[in-house]
Amino acid sequence: MTSGSVFKTVVYFSLPYLLSYFLQTLYGMADLFIVGQFGGVSSTTAVSIGSQIMHMITVMIVGLAMGSTVMIGRSVGAKNNRQAAECIGNTVTMFMGISMVLMAVLLVLVRPIVGIMSTPAEAVEGTVRYLTICFIGIPFITAYNIISSIFRGIGDSKSPMYFIAVACAANIGLDYLFIGLLGLDAAGAALGTTIAQAISVVVSLVVILKRKGGIRLEKSDFRPKRMTMKNILKVGVPVCLQDGFIQVSFVVITIFANQRGLTDAAAVGIVEKIISILFLVPSSMMSTISALAAQNIGAGKHDRAKLTLKYVLMITVTYGLIMTIIIQFVSVPLVGLFTNDGAVAVSGAGYLRSYASDCIFAGIHFCLSGYFYAYGLSVISFIHNSISIVCARIPLSYYASVHFKDTLFPMGCAAPAGSLISVIICVGVFIWLEHHEDKYQNI
């Protein structure tokens, strides 16, 4: 990770990341796709709204775990296995406690959450059932994501890919069982998701127990240590808050769509799933630059970290341009894969065509944010995302939802507009940092 061809390292390390994200997205889309084939619009809406809430919770957990990936990566890069073991142990202790508290709180608040989402009346009970079952599975979701963050921190991006592959296969099979054969609709989708996550965690624990490596964990590593947790949270909390804020903006946009009726509500839910596929490459590049740059920073190779940023930006922008062009020609049949309702497909296609360009702009600020994470400067990403959400994404979405009743196309423009603001801020910060290397390279 800290020697050899930088471009090859980026490609080899990012491919398992990309496949992992693809499988994780497929995992989430299976619920929506299978419910869409066997259930009605109300079931599809229940799963799309419920899965959006679960996605928000998951990305916040992943964001918090970014602190572990970065700190473990720095320790490994500096060849300090004792410090790496301490980071791993404290990560496990902290996240297991967080997951139990989160599960209890969310189970109590499930109905208020469904109400806040302005869920259409026909989909309320299905959404409640879906979320209740998924909330019970939060400890498994947390366990999978912290195990993955630990493996990636030590430079292993392949094992998490295998773990999610197991979960994905199990989820698809269980969805067909619970939804197709047993007719459980939204509740069946949630059961499949929760059980599949549990299976994945069991498999990952078996791998950990059989694995022998240079990092040895001791009981003392699991005891909370103030400085270790502080360093993890210093990076993780801003990322968690940033990702949470972004997801809240998506939820707000979903509420705007829900208020337009069942057709637009289902359309927006489906497009968000498609967008999650388009964002696989930008997301994998962000994670790649975070992990690789962290190890190189730990090894004192700052120029190599910067070169890594150059390559991930090149890959991401090229990909974004290609995808944006393709989507303009295939939007209707693409949305139609997830619904049998022609009106939903047409409505969603307009939203997707304008939204697609966000793949370019968001891709740029994703890569720069990942670079900032590696230096412990995650607060910068929180700031630029907050500004873009407050100044563009939410107000523009609201304006479009009120003044353009016949099409979702203008609503889709809000996301790339917000990302453009983030890009401007990120580039400005990067240029400033380049002129103050002596300060930020010693963080």
Model-derived segments and spans:
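Alpha-helical transmembrane segments of multipass membrane proteins
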Residues: 29-33, 104, 112, 146-150, ...
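Helix-terminus/linker motif at the lipid-water interface of multi-pass membrane proteins
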Residues: 26-45, 114-121, 177-184, 244-277, ...
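Residue-level hotspots within pore-lining transmembrane alpha-helices
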Residues: 19, 23, 27, 57, ...
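Short alpha-helical transmembrane segments in multi-pass integral membrane proteins
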Residues: 1-14, 72-139, 181-237, 293-358, ...
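Short runs within selected transmembrane alpha-helices of multi-pass transporters and secretion channels
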Residues: 65, 134-152, 160-168, 189-204, ...
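Transmembrane helical elements of multi-pass membrane transporters/channels
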Residues: 12-28, 133, 167, 196-200, ...
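Small-residue-rich hydrophobic transmembrane alpha-helices
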Residues: 44-104, 141-160, 254, 268-331, ...
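Signature of the first transmembrane helix
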Residues: 8-69, 73, 237-257
